[in-house]
């Protein structure tokens, strides 16, 4: 593969085979920036586990102190008085009328939050939402009766960590402009 001039310049600043501490890695990210936009900083950790074994499977959610730097679009599927709570908490889309849009392939959302009473209707969309990673899940806190708390958490930078099939965790943890 042919390297561009900027890539050649960057390849002299670090060694791909060397491991760096978090402090060193952050300094490298800031010193090797050459794009005109605010780059995302991704974290890839090789845990050396086999996710096919249930006892080695890791799946958790955590909140980042300063968010991810990304504006998360949240759809809340609920009905009744919970709709007002969701709108007040900052949800971008609210209501069960969006179920029809989801059936047609609409996916202009990053996360979907639902109340337990709406899960039977959302369950019918499992084949559409599952592969996109949008299906609400009680373990990740997206199936809940506390709609406002869940929406606020997602908007403020709650991320889901999950082991991939090779035993690696990939997650976006911020932007290169973060201090």
What are these regions (language model features)?
Residues 66-103, 109:
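Glycine-rich active-site/cofactor-binding loop and its immediate structural neighborhood
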Residues 11-14, 18, 26-36, 51, ...:
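Structural signal for hydrophobic packing residues in well-ordered secondary-structure cores
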Residues 91-179:
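Long, charge-patterned amphipathic alpha-helical coiled-coil/hairpin "stalk" segments used as oligomerization
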Residues 23-82:
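Translation machinery proteins
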Residues 17, 75, 114:
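Glycine- and other small-residue-rich loops at beta-strand/loop junctions that grip anionic moieties
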Residues 52-54, 83-85, 103, 121-122:
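Short active-site-adjacent helix-start/loop capping segments
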Residues 25, 86, 130:
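Residue-level signature of catalytic and energy-coupling elements of molecular machines
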Residues 1-15:
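Generic N-terminal amphipathic, Lys/Arg-enriched alpha-helix
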């Amino acid at each position: 593969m042919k390297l561009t001039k900027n890539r050649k310049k960057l390849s002299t600043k670090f060694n791909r085979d060397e491991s760096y501490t978090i402090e060193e890695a952050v300094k490298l990210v800031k010193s090797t920036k050459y794009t005109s936009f605010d780059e995302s900083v991704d974290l890839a950790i090789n845990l050396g586990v086999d996710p096919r074994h249930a006892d080695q499977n890791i799946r958790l959610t955590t909140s980042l102190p300063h968010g991810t730097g990304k504006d998360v679009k949240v759809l809340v599927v609920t009905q009744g008085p919970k709709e007002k709570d969701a709108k007040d908490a900052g949800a971008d889309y609210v209501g069960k009328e969006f179920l029809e849009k989801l059936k047609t392939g609409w996916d202009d959302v990053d996360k979907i939050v639902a109340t337990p009473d709406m899960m039977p209707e959302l369950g019918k969309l499992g084949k559409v939402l599952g592969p996109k990673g949008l299906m609400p899940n009680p373990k990740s806190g997206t199936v809940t009766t506390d709609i406002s708390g869940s929406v606020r958490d997602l908007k403020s930078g709650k991320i889901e960590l999950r082991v991939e099939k090779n035993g690696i965790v990939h997650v976006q943890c911020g932007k290169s402009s973060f201090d």
